[in-house]
Design a protein with these regions (language model features):
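Short, Lys/Arg-enriched N-terminal segments with co-localized hydrophobic residues
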Residues: 1-23
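Pre-Walker A (Motif I) flank of P-loop NTPase domains
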Residues: 27-31
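Short beta-strand-centered segment that lines the nucleotide-binding/catalytic pocket of NTP-utilizing
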Residues: 55-66
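ATP-dependent small-molecule kinase phosphotransfer cores
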Residues: 66-130
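Small-molecule kinase domains that catalyze NTP-dependent phosphoryl transfer to phosphate-bearing small molecules
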Residues: 83-94, 171-211
Length: 217
């Protein structure tokens, strides 16, 4: 489902969703949120998690992957930053195969394996509990999970710009450049690890079908 934040007039809440009386004990639900920079997707995800009284995971995945793998968390953070600065994404690689590389292998601390460990954590959490995932290609990693609802949050450029400027010391020109760079990185990151476009035709078809199934079931 694609959400234009500019159309949201009231905070996300059970009273506005037709979910009155619904509890997470009745049905496990995993919500994945991808978002444009400045659209408020992270805030929406956090609000939704609080409203539904379920955990919300974002950057915490790096710490959990570090603890699970024994790889220093700094390497996970460095990989995120390093990937932003190189032309790694010229071609879709689709490296995610659903398994991690063992410690005795040469590629144990490679960027690809760091992603594999994040994916492992995401799958394990989704098996255990209802939750919200923000970013991290979670929608693709959990694409075969029938309990997943995937959302892409976007907003008009002027809205994203104004919201981003309120939280930064950058001027308008600098922020526009930063927003474009960040969204391109997120799109390229997703394309590289999944082989799919961030929200291409294929993804739109999947989301429409998923919504129809929920709406009329």
């Amino acid at each position: 489902n694609r959400i234009d934040h500019n159309e949201i007039q009231t905070p996300v809440g059970l009273a506005n969703t037709g979910m009155e009386g619904f509890t997470m004990e009745e049905q496990k639900v995993i919500i994945t949120i991808a978002r444009q920079y400045g659209s408020g997707g992270k805030t929406i995800g956090q609000m939704l998690a609080e409203d539904l009284q379920i955990p919300c995971y974002s950057i915490e995945i790096l710490r959990m992957a570090s603890e699970d793998s024994g790889i220093n968390e700094m390497l996970f953070n460095q990989a995120d930053e390093k990937l932003k600065g190189i032309h790694l994404f010229s071609k879709a690689k689709g490296v995610y195969q659903g398994k991690v590389i063992p410690p005795e292998s040469d590629g144990f601390v490679s960027n690809d394996n760091l992603f594999n460990y994040q994916a492992k954590i995401i799958r394990e959490i989704a098996e255990k509990e209802s939750c919200v995932f923000i970013g991290r290609c979670a929608d693709f990693i959990l694409k075969d999970n029938p309990n997943v609802v995937s959302v892409f949050v976007h907003a008009p450029k002027d809205y994203c710009l104004q919201r981003a400027l309120e939280r930064s010391s950058m001027n308008e020109k600098e922020m526009l450049r930063f927003m474009a760079k960040t969204d391109k990185y997120r799109s390229d990151y997703y394309h590289y690890y999944t082989g799919r476009n961030w929200l291409g035709f294929e993804k739109c078809v999947e989301e429409i079908k998923a919504y129809i199934k929920v709406r009329f079931s």
